[in-house]
Amino acid sequence: MLARTIQRFSVVAKRGYAAAAPAANANPEELRLTFASPDTAVFSNAVVKQVDVPTLAGMVGVLANHVPTIGVLKPGVVSVTTNEGTVQRLFVSSGTLSVNIDGSCQVLAEEVLKVEEIDESAARAELDAAQRASGEGSEVARAEAQIRAEVAEALIKAATNQQ
């Protein structure tokens, strides 16, 4: 009886694994950037020279052949240098960075704003309001106010080219 039970359960379904799909235009000698937010695709698999990204671990400069990396974005300016040498500066509030072995890089941000579109006076007003709120209310409200203040400070730095 035990032999039949063991035999019945010894037929285990073998797990199949899919073969890795080849990446489209994979060339680790190129840096392919996808930079997007939920409502905006700034770059879509575009070949660029360099991307500088603010992360919780510090600024990360990404070039072709970069070691695979993941990171969490902090509020600040992402600088994208195209192959032609032009630099595009965009403010991000938060998000993720992923650098892959195939030469691709994804910057997925919660919010993206062109640096030249930042309203410095509105950012200063938000900073003042957040600082006032940081000493009031529940622990959650104080934490939210601290996050608002951090984003407002980063916006002001970006608007005044302090980054």
UniProtKB/Swiss-Prot annotation:
Highest taxon listed in the record's lineage: Eukaryota
GO biological process, alphabetically ordered: proton motive force-driven ATP synthesis
InterPro entries: ATP_synth_F1_dsu/esu, ATP_synth_F1_dsu/esu_N, ATPsynth_dsu/esu_N
Transit peptide, from-to: 1-18
Subcellular localization: Mitochondrion; Mitochondrion inner membrane
Subunit and partners: Subunit of the F-type ATPase which has 2 components, CF(1) - the catalytic core - and CF(0) - the membrane proton channel.
Purpose: Mitochondrial membrane ATP synthase (F(1)F(0) ATP synthase or Complex V) produces ATP from ADP in the presence of a proton gradient across the membrane which is generated by electron transport complexes of the respiratory chain. F-type ATPases consist of two structural domains, F(1) - containing the extramembraneous catalytic core, and F(0) - containing the membrane proton channel, linked together by a central stalk and a peripheral stalk. During catalysis, ATP turnover in the catalytic domain of F(1) is coupled via a rotary mechanism of the central stalk subunits to proton translocation.
The protein's name in its UniProt record: ATP synthase subunit delta, mitochondrial
Protein species of origin: Caenorhabditis elegans
